[in-house]
Amino acid sequence: GAGSRTTSFLVDDDVLIDAGTGVGELPLARLARIDHVFITHAHLDHIACLPLLVDSVGDLRPTPVTVYATDATLAVLRAHIFNWAVWPDFTRIPSPESAFMRFCPVVVGEPVELPGGRSITPLPAYHTVPAVGYHLAGTGGSLVFSGDTTSHPPFWQAVNSIPDLTHLIVETAFGDEEIALARASRHLCPSLLAEELARLNKRPQLWITHLKPGQFELIMEQVGRLAAAYSPRLLTHGQVLEF
């Protein structure tokens, strides 16, 4: 989104949704409080800071950082990131019995229960690699993040089943001038987003994220015109949402 950082959302003090370059804004003391990292998919803009995060805080924590993702995404992280060639395998450092990181597979539709009565549920998404969105259930409402996706009816079916949806964060990577590229790369553009929103049977606050650098104004003008009924707003760096 605006601010030229890649995707990462801090939830309370202890949960991270994706680990893009936005993580680098947090001081070490706050990084050390992150217990849970939920990854939508394995593309670099969503995992760039994960290796550095675990390396930085591993010996500052009494327990490992738990990384949640689908089996397919965890397999990519094992094979291509934490493989000793690109980065050490922190699921085995300093030992397999007392590692700095552990992997936990997630399944679409199955909630992960967290302390404090919170839960996070993977949602179906459709991208060039296996991907999910996430539904975050809080005490006063819910938030949904689409992750990277293109048109995908199962995502909207899942969203429509959430009774207390407060915030909906959806990617819109390209302007309509690049609709062919949006389709090929399995992202959304404003006209595709408008078609998808027609499937939505509720009116949460709509936030737009994952915009192509240099095209924020163009994309938001198009989104504002094509999806005006949803009062879309640009999600900006450092913004705080309550639910």
Model-predicted regions and their roles:
Residues V54-D55, L60-D71, C104:
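Glycine/small-residue-rich loop that forms an oxyanion/phosphate-binding "nest" at active or ligand-binding sites
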Residues I17-G20, D35-D45, Y68-T70, V144-T149, ...:
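Active-site neighborhood of phospho(di)ester-bond hydrolases with catalytic His/Asp-centered motifs
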